């Protein structure tokens, strides 16, 4: 049996940081950083969030700083 391909055209993900003209990703802005964290507390990859490589590095560093400062958890509670 031949397998059929499914799906159509995928919508391109938009870089949230670039779209909203955010110049500096602040580690104290927890609401912004929570957009880039999974329910388990892990940093979401670029292919999921759609951020550019440059902005992904900014987000990752800000999340790591916020974790060390105690603003974000390292792992989510069940």
From Swiss-Prot:
It comes from the Bacteria. One of its GO terms (cellular component) is cytosolic small ribosomal subunit. Keywords: Ribonucleoprotein, Ribosomal protein, RNA-binding, rRNA-binding. One of its GO terms (biological process) is translation. One of its GO terms (molecular function) is structural constituent of ribosome. The keyword 4Fe-4S does not apply. Transmembrane segments: none annotated. PROSITE patterns: RIBOSOMAL_S18. PANTHER family: 30S RIBOSOMAL PROTEIN S18, SMALL RIBOSOMAL SUBUNIT PROTEIN BS18M. Part of the 30S ribosomal subunit. Forms a tight heterodimer with protein bS6. Belongs to the bacterial ribosomal protein bS18 family. Binds as a heterodimer with protein bS6 to the central domain of the 16S rRNA, where it helps stabilize the platform of the 30S subunit. HAMAP family: Ribosomal_bS18. NCBIfam families: S18 (TIGR00165). This is Small ribosomal subunit protein bS18. The gene is rpsR.
